[in-house]
Amino acid sequence: MEKYLVGGAVRDALLKLPVQEKDWVVVGSSPQEMLNIGYEQVGKDFPVFLHPESHEEYALARTERKSGQGYTGFICHTAPSITIEEDLYRRDLTINAMAYDSHGNLIDPYHGQRDIKLRLLRHVSHTFHEDPLRVLRVARFAARFAHMNFAIAPETLILMKQMIHELLSLSPERIWTETKKALITDNPQVYFTVLRHCGALKILFPELDALFDIPTPTQYCTKINTGYYTMTTLSKAAYLTDDISVRFSVLCRDLGKGIPLNKINKNTKHHDHRKLGITLIHNLCNRFKIPHEIRNFSKITSEYHDYLYNVKILKPEMLMTLFHVFDCWRRPNRIDQIILVSQSDPIRWKNYNNYSLNQENLLRTAFTVTKKISTVDIIKDGFTGSNISRELYARRLHALNSWKNKQI
């Protein structure tokens, strides 16, 4: 029996990155032998075991053969005779197809170390095209390692373009899992850009893909492509925060500008894009079973984000509406989230630093004014039942009016 450290742990060690988790491959063993020495079997499709002390995963070396469509259409074969080189051959990218043996020697039959030096994401073998999930994985790795100047090998990108017809065989959960992982990288915009380059964006996220045909007239700049503008905005959001709700809402904020393409003039100012976007976000989130917390914040942001840039001129009633729809009184962190959404817009805020800071301060101050109104005081004053909420609204509105009058 030989044990090898494999995959991401080896790659990250060579890149001098923190190793998050360790995966192992066992050569020369059998399921029964693993059980006999105290390992716990957890894999259903192929033999994977948990170490009795470290609880790290140990998989028996295996080969895979394509048997049907999708990423699950494989027949796995395990046997004591399967070598580490055969096991590594089934992996997606050369940088993920390396191992360390028990003596610390690097096993690198497919030149992963070379591609790390070249900063290339290159497929291991022709069998790459058999698993459509690899299109998403490569796009995610491109996003994850963009700050290290990794690029996709041209021959790998060609294969990805040939694989997109099988993408719809992937489960919605699997697509969202890869997308979520990409969204929390330092450069999530790279993930969607890669998907567009290989044709996958049009299949999986047609709402996003449509934006690349639409210009965005703004008062701050000349007409620019809405798709690229969205990618720039997502990049700015990723720089500002790790909050996936903020990042996703920024990604989806302008979806309404992309439809209906056959009815909207490409030179339109998209007056109705906010409401159009709500339906698109709802459908997209349902399609991929995206968590309610993320989808709800994104839908609200789509409808109300334009108001966030003009806090100074908003009437108290509109400020109250904003605080209500974003549920700020019960969830004060929402104020930080919506400010981050507004700060992510690179065009609106460019060269307007003092103005933008003032808008942010005004929004925070306005919310603080309303938050000081206590329900306890209202109850002490004798209000009961539904009259409590009505009086709470009235007092908050009055406080905002008084505050606004002092700003003039």
Curated annotation (Swiss-Prot):
Pfam families on file: PolyA_pol, PolyA_pol_RNAbd
The EC number(s) this enzyme carries: 2.7.7.72
Limits of the HD domain: 226-329
Residues given in the record as CTP binding sites: G8, R11, R91, R137, R140
CDD domains (alphabetical): NT_ClassII-CCAase (cd05398)
Top-level taxonomic group: Bacteria
Catalysed conversion reaction: a tRNA precursor + 2 CTP + ATP = a tRNA with a 3' CCA end + 3 diphosphate; a tRNA with a 3' CCA end + 2 CTP + ATP = a tRNA with a 3' CCACCA end + 3 diphosphate
Binding site for ATP: G8, R11, R91, R137, R140
Cofactor entry: Mg(2+)
Binding site for Mg(2+): E21, D23
Gene3D superfamilies per the UniProt record, alphabetical: Beta Polymerase, domain 2, cca-adding enzyme, domain 2
BP terms from Gene Ontology: RNA repair; tRNA 3'-terminal CCA addition
One MF annotation (Gene Ontology) recorded for this entry: CCA tRNA nucleotidyltransferase activity
Top EC group: transferase
SUPFAM superfamilies, per the entry: Nucleotidyltransferase, Poly A polymerase C-terminal region-like
NCBIfam families: PRK10885.1, PRK13298.1
Annotated PANTHER family: MULTIFUNCTIONAL CCA PROTEIN (PTHR47545:SF1)
Any further remark recorded for this protein: A single active site specifically recognizes both ATP and CTP and is responsible for their addition.
Job description of the protein: Catalyzes the addition and repair of the essential 3'-terminal CCA sequence in tRNAs without using a nucleic acid template. Adds these three nucleotides in the order of C, C, and A to the tRNA nucleotide-73, using CTP and ATP as substrates and producing inorganic pyrophosphate. tRNA 3'-terminal CCA addition is required both for tRNA processing and repair. Also involved in tRNA surveillance by mediating tandem CCA addition to generate a CCACCA at the 3' terminus of unstable tRNAs. While stable tRNAs receive only 3'-terminal CCA, unstable tRNAs are marked with CCACCA and rapidly degraded.
The family this protein is said to belong to: Belongs to the tRNA nucleotidyltransferase/poly(A) polymerase family. Bacterial CCA-adding enzyme type 2 subfamily.
Identification of the protein by name: CCA-adding enzyme
